[in-house]
A protein has these predicted regions:
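Short helix-loop capping/hinge motifs at secondary-structure junctions, enriched
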Residues: 74-77, 124-128, 287-291, 342-344
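Extended, compositionally biased flexible segments
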Residues: 1-72, 198-277, 420
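Short, conserved beta-strand element in jelly-roll/cupin
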Residues: 38, 67-72, 158, 169, ...
Length: 429
């Protein structure tokens, strides 16, 4: 799998029924209005026959589903035209720890190494009435039918392509039921569906997996960008949130990246689009279970990003959701990577944002809630960070709306200045 793996939560009617009462209460306050998207990063993706690592002391759940494989570039596709953009389908296992909440991104539950086995692709005539069977050690443990999905494969492709351009090789996992099958070390989990090649993977203890790992993770064209929400206390206060006690991490899809001196589109009929100046840490070598004391040894350098957000699209599901943070071209990054030796103290750098030459935002990395070594140690505790992966460390207070015609410059002292211009949907066509 060379593309991005997108997945959707709360897309099976059994999930919606189980959570119906909770949806009317805080922190949700209302049922989800749109598809609840998340990303399975490249460290999660394994192939048929490769082992699923079982982290000690956790409960691990199998999530048999189907992956839609994109066949050609898709942007703003109507559901009735979706079939023309689908190369085929494959069985998938959206492995996860149990989820007790859908409010914040579930990176610790869903983004662990090997937590997304993907099978071989094949054409399929009717994905909307497909029985998916899970076998554990040769015995059926569960089955369900895609007719019970809230949104069909075509509807999901249409919904995602409305804000994110999909590329050949991208995958969309269609969802899982509320009840999942528990796994144990030593199990062999096999997923079956008529017309698709079977997907089978052994489950091994994580420490055994680390000792005997003989394959390399599938690499994508770019590294994964992990982003931090509310990592400056003044920014959390600005948004009326209590500073988090654990890092609030979400993942940015590659479609959202754009470069220095490029444009970002403000969607029509939105009320609030704001910038976020951020220091980005670039990982230089494979990091797994790294201590804070040694974490900086895994840093290659630093760059700058502007993590734009469209606040109109915020919902209280995996907040901040992909419609807010992963729209096409909404994350300028660059203009270069500065070697870590050129930055004497990354925890004492001034960040500034200028809009049309006016200073709108200023802060310092000295005010980070979670330091760079802590973040590397935190993430590498449950997933493998790979060379080229990036961590956007958050933004200080000072947000304001930007509109078409604005020139936005974000800078990080000693790292660089990143220039970007806001345009309307019409001028971007």
């Amino acid at each position: 799998m060379k593309g991005t793996v997108f997945a959707v939560a709360l897309n099976h009617r059994s999930q919606l029924d189980a959570w119906q009462e909770a949806f009317s209460q805080p922190p949700y306050n209302a049922p989800p209005k749109t598809a609840v998207w998340f990303i399975k990063p490249r460290n999660t993706v394994i192939r048929h026959g490769e082992p699923i690592p079982y982290p000690q002391g956790e409960k691990v759940l199998s999530g048999a589903t189907v992956a839609l494989i994109v066949g050609k570039t898709a942007s703003r596709i109507r559901p009735e035209a979706a079939a023309d953009y689908i190369a085929g389908y494959a069985l998938a296992n959206e492995v996860s720890l149990p989820e007790e909440s859908f409010y914040r991104p579930a990176i610790k539950a869903k983004c662990r190494d090997g937590f997304c086995p993907l099978g071989e692709m094949a054409p399929l005539s009717d994905v909307d009435n497909l029985t998916i069977i899970t076998e554990i050690n040769g015995r059926e443990a569960d089955h369900w039918n895609t007719a019970d999905l809230q949104r069909s494969a075509a509807q999901l492709l249409s919904a995602l392509s409305e804000f994110a351009t999909l590329n050949p090789g991208d995958a969309i996992l269609l969802g899982t039921p509320q009840n999942r099958v528990a796994l144990r070390p030593g199990d062999r989990v096999r997923i079956l569906a008529r017309g698709l090649p079977a997907l089978e993977n052994p489950v091994v203890a994580e420490d055994e997996f680390a000792r005997h790992q003989t394959f390399t993770w599938p690499l994508s064209a770019t590294g994964t960008l992990f982003a931090l929400g509310l990592n400056y206390a003044d920014h959390a206060s600005e948004l009326a949130f209590t500073p988090p006690k654990e890092p609030l991490v979400f993942i940015k899809a590659p479609n959202t990246f754009t470069e220095h001196h490029q444009t970002s589109v403000r969607p029509n009929n939105v009320e609030y689009m704001h910038y976020e100046a951020e220091l980005v840490v670039v990982i230089g070598k494979t990091a797994r279970k790294v201590s804070e004391a040694e974490a900086m040894e895994y840093v290659a350098g630093y760059t700058v990003c502007n993590d734009y957000a469209i606040r109109d699209y915020l919902e209280n599901y995996y907040r901040p959701n992909l419609r807010v943070k992963s729209r096409d071209g909404l994350t300028p990054i660059g203009p270069w990577i500065v070697d870590k030796e050129a930055v004497s103290d990354p925890h004492n750098l001034t960040l500034r944002t200028f809009v049309n030459g006016e200073l709108r935002q200023e802060g310092t990395t000295a005010d980070l809630i979670f330091s760079i070594p802590f973040l590397i140690s935190y993430l590498s505790e449950f997933m493998t960070l790979q060379p080229g992966d990036m961590i956007a460390t958050g933004t200080p207070k000072g947000l304001s709306d930007v509109v078409p015609g604005d020139e936005v410059v974000v800078e990080v002292e000693g790292v660089g200045r990143l220039v970007n211009r806001i345009v309307s949907e019409e001028s971007a066509k």
